[in-house]
Amino acid sequence: MARLLEHYRGEVKPKLKDEMGYKNIMEVPKLEKVVVNMGIGDAKDNPKILDNAVENLEQVTGQKPVVTKAKRSIANFKVRQGMPVGCKVTLRGERMYHFLDKLINVALPRVRDFKGVSPKAFDGRGNYSLGLKEQMVFPELEYDDIERVQGMDIIIATTAETDEEAKKLLERLGMPFSG
């Protein structure tokens, strides 16, 4: 079982129940899913860039990504409907906890000049988003194997009703918020 999942079930869940004043343990917010997305604008010119991004994302998450396609044509970006423009992975269950554990304890501390993640990136419904400027912070990726430094968006969806509940949950799980 994932270390972070054990920590959640053993320590975080009971403490949050007492702290928030819930009557039932099932009311305590939990992680629902983690979506990792890489938007690759240059995929239209060079399909090899997209293949590398898919490979990198698979190494980082342990799951094969889905190639995302443009929903509509945009002439200014020279993109036609149906063209591949990125890739994403939706993680749930044990893989989600493994990835989040690795993100919090390994990847984020390796970010240059890291002072914590913004506490303002909640969406109003208990979900949190953060962006990484480069994929090199993950230990699975070797510097020599990377053809192009690529950023990624990470969305953490929770069952929390409010941003405050979600923030308390993520803080208890070890998310390093700044300020």
Swiss-Prot record:
UniProt-listed GO biological process terms: translation
InterPro entries: Ribosomal_uL5, Ribosomal_uL5_bac-type, Ribosomal_uL5_C, Ribosomal_uL5_CS, Ribosomal_uL5_dom_sf, Ribosomal_uL5_N
A GO MF term: rRNA binding
Cellular component annotations (GO), alphabetically ordered: ribonucleoprotein complex; ribosome
Function, in words: This is one of the proteins that bind and probably mediate the attachment of the 5S RNA into the large ribosomal subunit, where it forms part of the central protuberance. In the 70S ribosome it contacts protein S13 of the 30S subunit (bridge B1b), connecting the 2 subunits; this bridge is implicated in subunit movement. Contacts the P site tRNA; the 5S rRNA and some of its associated proteins might help stabilize positioning of ribosome-bound tRNAs.
Subunit composition and interactions: Part of the 50S ribosomal subunit; part of the 5S rRNA/L5/L18/L25 subcomplex. Contacts the 5S rRNA and the P site tRNA. Forms a bridge to the 30S subunit in the 70S ribosome.
Family stated for the protein in its record: Belongs to the universal ribosomal protein uL5 family.
Protein name stated in the entry: Large ribosomal subunit protein uL5
Species, as recorded: Natranaerobius thermophilus (strain ATCC BAA-1301 / DSM 18059 / JW/NM-WN-LF)
